[in-house]
Amino acid sequence: MVEKILIHRILTLFPNAIARKLLLMLTFILIFWIIYLASKDHTKFSFNLENHIILNQGNIFKKYSHSETPLCPAVSPKETELRIKDIMEKLDQQIPPRPFTHVNTTTSATHSTATILNPQDTYCRGDQLDILLEVRDHLGHRKQYGGDFLRARMYSTALMAGASGKVTDFNNGTYLVSFTLFWEGQVSLSLLLIHPSEGVSALWRARNQGCDRIIFTGLFANRSSNVFTECGLTLNTNAELCQYMDDRDQEAFYCVRPQHMPCEALTHMTTRTRNISYLSKEEWRLFHRSNIGVEMMKNFTPIEVIPCNKSENIKKNCQIGMKTPFPSGYTLKKMWITAFCKQIKFNETKNINDCLERKLIYLMGDSTLHQWIYYLQKAVKTLKYFDHHGAGIFKTHVLLDVERHILIQWKKHGHPFVTKKLFSVKDENYIPREIDQVAGDKNTAIVITLGQHFRPFPINIFIRRAINIQKAIERLFLRSPETKVILKTENTREIEQNAEMFSDFHGYIQNLIIRDIFVDLNVGIIDAWDMTIAYCTNNAHPPDYVIQNQIGMFLNYIC
């Protein structure tokens, strides 16, 4: 219609018939040309838009199907790798290589000398007692470097009292050992040579050489058929593998894929040690039981500590975010007394129930935190066990008090989890993912412990997990700054265990890493390392009175 009106108006301007015909032809040609160009551009625009949508849909499908790229990485893989590298370099500087050809040139507890500085007949409660240690080898020669793994402790058996001592290494063969005299009475002093520096260096080198000292065996179930295959953090095989990846956090676990079964058929796992060592025969001599934990202060008589009428410093109530010194406290009559804050005693069921009322508590970690569940179930009769079904002792464990709206849940951490007992992997997750699933509020508390199961593996695996947990806590605090997060450090463990894989030296290094990575986070610290030295338990799973005091510290943080 518009075209006809336009043509009619143009023709009235040209009365000549021939001119009008020519003009009419040119007008039609022009109109068709415009329509052609318009339709071509429209087609081109439509194609580009549709193509853009198709490509984007393809990318989304790719991400969800193959998980090549994390959707919202909290920290780039590159940044994490740089942090791991930086921490590793610092540790390598602290633990330099100390090769030796004979045990005689390593540190000797017998030939080393310890001297009390400024000795007195009596000491005042609260004083600091200092000891200078000069180390020598088995030939009596002064050593010119440090790096020995020492454990200092003061104790009074009659009072059931104990505390850690602080060791300062001057890196020249001399050490300062400092004790804070926390209580009155006769006090004995102990300084153990756990490993000489040469043994420490050997452990550090051996630890970081491979993941193959532990064998993981996975159970795949498909209808009536069960198949066991080898699994691990790394696998050196040409067989087809199932890859269980967490791309965001750069965590990986692998299993040899059984024939005619999907990777999702993996249901359970068990582990055992492999007969392999990265220590030489000469190095192994340092880890015979008779050479581990040798007393360096055998001939010291107990010292006498008196009150001296010294006034005690007024301490603030224990709260999350406080910096914990070392030693962080001491034991007296089996009770743990903190050195940096004022504790509330939770000795009665009513006190504990009042504290826990309306609380959601998530325990994430290993069996040393699982002990809390068992203790609370015995100590607080109103907490009832909720059966999650499933097999084995390492399934998710829940205690409920419906009347008081209390929930306490324990879940094991993700790989590596080292145990001969068969455990389910279907309810398993890495701790950062578990933290991401907690909404959080002022009545929510999370307790995390990590370490014992990481000791047989290269340290970079532990560092990566700790960094990922730190990032998850930061995300939690962004959505819920009132949520309370508490870190329980590792317990000391049995000296008789395979030192190459389970030595407390590995736990000590992991303790340093945890404190470094979490230093700026507003979290509470339960220094189980310090506690178990003070109690002298030498057991990865200490007795109930130690667990009671760990839980008591936790209750002080959340109430």
Curated annotation (Swiss-Prot):
Subcellular location(s): the record lists: Membrane
- Keyword field contains Protein biosynthesis: no
Bilayer disposition of the protein: Single-pass membrane protein
GO CC, alphabetical: membrane
> Main localization of the protein?
membrane
Q: Which family does it belong to?
A: Belongs to the NXPE family.
Q: Tell me what this protein is called.
A: NXPE family member 2
Q: Origin organism of this chain?
A: Homo sapiens
Question: Which gene produces this protein?
Answer: NXPE2
